[in-house]
Amino acid sequence: MLNKMKIESQLAQIGSIKEPVTGAVSYPIYQATAFRHPKLGQSTGFDYSRSKSPTRSVLEEAAAQLEAGDAAFACSSGMAALQTVFTLFSHGDHLIVSLDLYGGTYRLLERIMTRFGVTASYVDTNDLDAMSERLQPNTKAILVETPTNPLMMITDLELVSSWAKDRGLLTIVDNTLLTPFFQRPIELGADIVVHSATKYLGGHNDVLAGLIIAKGEQLCAELAFLHNSIGAVLGPQDSFLLMRGMKTLALRMERHEYNATAIANYLLEHEAVEEVYYPALRNHPGHSIQNKQSSGNTGIFSFRLKDARYVEPILRHIKLIAFAESLGGVESLMTYPAVQTHADIPEEIRRAIGVDDRLLRLSVGIEHVDDLIADLEQALTAAKQELQ
């Protein structure tokens, strides 16, 4: 029944009808690692919690439904989810990856996966000619972030998924920034979706989690084997917290988008700001593609200051907005990508994509937008006065 309802109803009802014994509206935390067998050769469906646990199973069922996949796998972090997906590949395999990429993903690919002989080429995934140039006989998959972090570049998922499918490649999409509330990559042709569920899905900066959602029986079976064998699974407490956060995802994403759009437009007109990178703005190069494949916009964007000397005093003077290294929570956070989230990416790549010493990233929370703008205004004013 739930899968026929609107996504708002699906989210609010996660786990609420899954506990038949007591009728608990909130699905309980099964803090157990082992489960009794009725008799030899029989199982309740749960044996050992690394392989499967009741609380995590309810979360995974909900995630698969929301992302239109056949199965989902909850991991101990977003990086654990990516690591599990990357172990689909073997020594000698090659991946094509979005050029503008989260620094942690780049670090995992370049400093860990290369040890096992898996290599990657980084390319603008909107440029099919450039991707074709990087295509190798041993290429197995394409990994896409859309929007990218932090420059908010948009990739046409239908186009890229079709291109990949024609060449026998898997399409993996990081959907962290939009969530299934605004974008469902599997419906657009992707094979695998990954999330840092720590971010918008959890939404409260209090749970570390990752999700993998996949389509196709064979692919799901292989991921289930890897998920169990690697063992970077999500525990019952964190599974419960993630489900609790997801129940309010619709309300939060709508407020994130509303606030971010208002603040992006405010900064666009500010004398200290050179450029704002946010797909909701009409001048954004990916605006039309974003509107075609997504029903809304994320709550995160980046902006470039005219003078790098503004950065330090702005970060020192913000009060309501926290200078902290994450995104997607109800609290607003500001980050300096060049020295934080993207510090592991070589400087020449950072500069090529625009992650320089003038770029700040703002994860807009659900506070009142007037208070957030007032905080930015006073910080920008204070920074200007210090530089005079």
Q: How would you describe each model-predicted region?
A:
Residues T261-E325, I345-R351:
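Conserved small-domain helix->loop->beta segment predominantly found in fold-type I
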Residues A34-Q83, T87-L88, G104-R111:
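Conserved N-terminal alpha-helix of the aminotransferase class I/II PLP-enzyme fold
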Residues M1-F46, Q388:
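N-terminal glycine-rich, Lys/His-bearing helix-loop that initiates the first secondary-structure elements
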Residues T119, E133, P137, R252, ...:
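PLP-dependent enzyme catalytic core of the Aspartate aminotransferase-like
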Residues I29, H37-V58, L333-R358:
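Glycine-rich phosphate/pyrophosphate-binding loop
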Residues L242-L251, T298-K306, R361-G365:
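Short, well-ordered beta-strand elements within core beta-sheets of diverse protein domains
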Residues A68, N138, A272-E275, L320, ...:
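Glycine-centered tight turns that cap/initiate beta-strands
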Residues L2, Q13, A72-A272:
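Conserved PLP-enzyme active-site core in the AAT-like
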